[in-house]
Amino acid sequence: MKYNQLGKTDLKVSELSFGTWAIGGSWGNTSDEEALKALERAMDAGVNFFDTADVYGDGHSEELLAKATKGKESEIHIASKFCRAGDIHDPATYSEESVTAYLENSLKRLQRDQLDLYQIHCPPFEILKDGRVFEVLDKLKQQGKIRYYGVSVETVEEGLFCLEKENVSSLQVIFNMLRQKPLEELFPTAKQKGVGIIARVPLASGLLTGKFTTDHQFETDDHRQFNKDGEAFNVGETFGGLPFEKGVALSNQLSWVAEDRGNRTRAALKWIMQQEGVSTVIPGFKNVRQVEDNLQAVEVPHFTQDELEKIRVFYKNEVHEHIRGRY
């Protein structure tokens, strides 16, 4: 496993890490026992960074991480997120009192005294522009309750704005082969400013695994069913903003990336790990098999310059126009 510095922080994070949205719920049926085994397998392979949020299973994914990382607090870094347990448009959600309460609850569930990275969870742009939430986070950092803070953003514009805040240590962005806009300006600027990039939705909610056909039916409690057209939250969080049927067709046109790399999942993750400025990529998982498959991405061959250019042109000519939502 290769480790990258998360921006200017002193955190060295595994280039392949994991997100825990799926094991908290919202991705259909999950098993705690299987999730704990999967977390153990990831850590055994050298994964030292996990991303979670207070709303993933109403805190359940944080509780699972507490169990899995007991006794390993100094070596396993955890990033959590806040604001979506409240009204994201209400400034009171971002007050010192509210944010401190969210943090204390997360720390209690995680059974930790300090959080390595605390991220604002896709707030509206007006909240970021207001700026007071950054002052609150500065205070929590001074108090030693968090080591660093960052922002999970929905758009490149929001990301560029956050890069002007001197104490923002990381940005979490939707980024995959079917959603490449951050490469143009956001990643180079983040690198220049010394801000780490955490790539989320790397498989476009499973589209880039190649396992779906257009008639696939998701469970009703899976966001790929209830948010497929952005009914519940930003459409970009589900299938990277692509209509499902179109996404399946586009993914199939990328089937060639699996040659010499085992499968499309590993290829899609490797492609992200190859992009300059990306600190870590955080695919989700539900079981040991998925973790093991994702871990193989570290070992597969790099993309050649010709292949990278082919993927860039494909995105520009075939994909970009079909992406919906704020981007």
Language-model segments: what does each one mean?
Residues T30-A42, Y94-L110, E154-F161:
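Short, acidic/polar
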